[in-house]
Amino acid sequence: MSDPLERLRALQGADLPVHGGRTLAYVYDSGDPEIDRIAREAVAAYAASNALDPTAFPSLLQMENELVGFACDLLDAPDTAVGTVTSGGTESILLAVQGARDSRPEVTAPRMVLPATAHAAFHKAAHYYGVEAVLVPVGPDFRADPDTMAQAMDDDTVLVVASAPSYAHGVVDPVTEIAAAAAARGIRCHVDACIGGWVLPYAARLGRQVPAWTFAVEGVTSMSVDTHKYAYAPKGTSLLVHRDAGLRKAQLFASAAWPGYTMLNATTQSTRSGGPIAGTWAVVEHIGDSGYAELADRAFSAVDAIVACIEWEPGLHVVGTPDSTLVTLATDDSLDPFTLTDELVSRGWYVQPQLSFGPDAPSIHLSVSAGTLAHVEDFAGALTESVAAARAAGPVAVDAGVVAFIEALDPASLTDDDFDGLLAASGLVGASEDGELELPSRMAEVNAMLDVASPAMREALLKAFLDRLQRPVRRPA
């Protein structure tokens, strides 16, 4: 019989590295192996525990309450604040929207006002819960415009959203003005600090200029903050914090309408593994406030160094002014951003391409963590080489006939055969019979084709791609 752990390690060889500070999306590396060891041991110790019933596993309840308490101190939360440990930022956002909707049962057509830069999880919440997402354009600095946000609010608005920071550009919205406008109309204001909530408080302590964004701002009613990002905890935890218990009440669920146990949940999940909770608690206990200050200092030092590298390279510029640890770069017409992405990836630096949106050109996203600091000189060299290679390769051009064909398509009317043809033409094949992912070695042409498609067509193509990826692999008889 084969060793499953040996096969597991072989499978993992195809994944992006989670350590080494070179994967600048999806993972957040502290650069400290001891933090990883503590997390692994805590997760393993609680892998079989179930946070479904806090009276059955009171240790998990204690850990959750202590995590929320640590976050409350970071977020300037009042003594009345309460919080919930969720499975990730998307669930925190889903619950914030669900709670806002259900707190206003008299509103039959609920709406929420979002900056165009708000995280896509709010669109998911709108889809799940039947809340209309009212998108408001941002200014040239990529921050929400408070006056335009205020004008979009009406009697059916149940939630107003601001980002701290926005994922795509790394800037903090003017929370003070937005929250004041929401409060004046009696509307909840949620600050999405999923990616900034555990690092921005230390930015202020380090003397960096950060717009006000915490519960210290009057009118902010709830905040989401992910612990698996800049708390450097294991994947699978986030926090949703409310200013007071009354604001959380609509989020809680109970059902005694069946013959089994009375279901009682504070999240969308019932069964919740104790592993991520214990892993997160152990990491936060180990690092502590002073440790997080040191890690934040390293992350911001890496940000400053990377920004300097980008600004030094002809043809590159930083998009917006980073308030946090997210850096967005764009290119001029002398080189193609998608080719530049491929070149960086080929040199061991995973960066995330962002497609054009509205008037904004394609860009490249970097989530910088403390573990990146030790490698910034390597990044500088890789960036210089990648820029030269991308410039020499020239732009990736999508045939005009293909562009016209894509623009004429209605994604709602396409059949599975149509999608198969489009996916094959784009290079997004999917998975083979043995479940292996099949993608081209370089993604520039794929991204260029997606870039000329409308957002609706991108969504349809990528959902078709995901459907073809997730197909069962059967064992031979």
Predicted regions and their residues:
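Active-site C-terminal subdomain of aminotransferase-like
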Residues: 205, 209-325, 329-334, 477
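Non-catalytic terminal extensions of PLP-dependent enzymes
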Residues: 1-61, 65-69, 330-477
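Active-site nucleophile and cofactor-binding loops and adjacent substrate-binding regions
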Residues: 56-60, 83-90, 114-116, 320, ...
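Predominant activation on well-ordered alpha-helical scaffold segments within soluble catalytic domains
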Residues: 64-72, 94-101, 123, 176-179, ...
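A generic structural signal for well-ordered alpha-helical segments
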Residues: 126, 182, 310-311, 344
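Conserved PLP-enzyme active-site core in the AAT-like
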Residues: 80, 87-254, 261-266
